[in-house]
Amino acid sequence: RRSELAVTMWIAYHRLFDRAGEQSLVDHYRAVYAPNAPGFARMQVQLKALADYAKAHQIRLYLAMTPDVHNLVDYKFGFVHDTMRQIAQGDGYTYVDLLPAMQGRPPEELFAMPGDPHPNALGHQLMADAIFPVIK
């Protein structure tokens, strides 16, 4: 209950004081996944290190790409999926894109609670249904 209040307050604050709209979220993701972004470069190094370890120890790796569920009808973040697919394939991961399992659904169907885009039980079930055939 306390975490729901914190999330609700965080959402209310950001809706009032941040740049509004989907475009600000797209801009944020473009900045995060820019080739020269320090966090992006660190992520690539860590994914490669994990891949090298897995290869040395004969471990299969999977990268499941979870979509941003704010707008699954007119999805604006395909560039993130493309980037992560390229990295995964280059490093030897099996890539599983979860967007097709969720695309076209209204976000409210998948939100853990109003305004919180973390997946609810249905979202988790859709992801599991998409991942299971790949890993079995």
What does each model-identified segment do?
Residues R1-Q86, G90-Y93, L98-G104, E108-E109:
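Serine-dependent acyl-ester chemistry module
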Residues P114-K136:
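Histidine-centered active-site loop/cap adjacent to the catalytic His
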